[in-house]
A protein has these predicted regions:
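Secreted/extracellular ectodomain signature
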Residues: 21-212
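Bacterial N-terminal signal peptides that target proteins for export
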Residues: 1-8
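Cleavable N-terminal signal peptides
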Residues: 9-10, 20
Length: 212
């Protein structure tokens, strides 16, 4: 029996190593498995980007530039930032090797492959959607349908507030309520910016991460 177990263990280890290599080689899109824990206060774009990189590295992915899919409005002398302009040019693949979009225009069209099945976290696990307990389908974006920045009041003070305000969110499962219920990036605004507010709307402070 021992002679059989050793080769099987070796094959299992090799398979796991191959899977990790494949994921690290292709993974360039995911939903964060956890948020900041402080509502929509992500530490600004810089803090959100760092969170993306930290989760990716924990999943075994290194050597890539990660950016959170988040927009900010013009403030304090700084120009507005559009989510679509900060995520690279594509293509993007999830942790299971599925190409979700070929380029920026494809991502913001009906041709993308974003869905509850394909919009997974950095480990390849599905994120709770409508009908699950708890529902966590509200994904922070602060963006329009085309990935552009919105007016002040749609990004919780440019992702630095956990108090009053609102953040525009999308539905990763492509269903629910709001002005654009099937939109992955611009379904509706939240009731506030605190963790409790986000959870009461149907989210958990999660956001999309893209890499190149």
């Amino acid at each position: 029996m021992k002679r059989i177990i050793a080769p099987v263990a070796a094959l299992t280890l090799a398979a796991c190593s191959s899977l990790a290599f494949a994921q690290g080689d292709t993974l360039s899109f995911f939903i964060t498995s956890v948020g900041s824990g402080d509502g929509a206060n992500l530490g600004g774009l810089e803090g959100a980007d760092e969170h993306c990189a930290t989760l990716a590295e924990a999943a075994g992915v290194t050597g890539k530039t990660w950016r959170a899919y988040l927009s900010t409005h013009a403030a304090d002398g700084n120009d507005a930032v559009n989510a679509r302009d900060r995520i690279g040019s594509g293509p993007w693949f999830n942790a299971n090797g599925v190409q979700v979009a070929a380029n920026v225009d494809d991502l913001h069209s009906d041709n993308n492959m974003l869905s509850k099945k394909n919009s997974v976290d950095e480990n390849g696990d599905q994120v709770n959607g409508r009908g699950d307990d708890p529902n966590m389908h509200d994904i922070l974006t602060g963006s329009t349908l085309q990935g552009m920045a919105m007016d002040a009041g749609a990004s919780c003070s440019n992702w630095t507030s956990n108090g009053e305000g609102s953040a525009q969110v999308g539905h990763h499962d492509r269903q629910g309520g709001g002005a654009n219920p099937t939109s992955w990036n611009s379904a509706h605004g939240t009731r506030g910016c605190s963790q409790e507010n986000l959870e009461s709307t149907g989210g958990d402070g999660l956001f999309y991460c893209f890499a190149w």
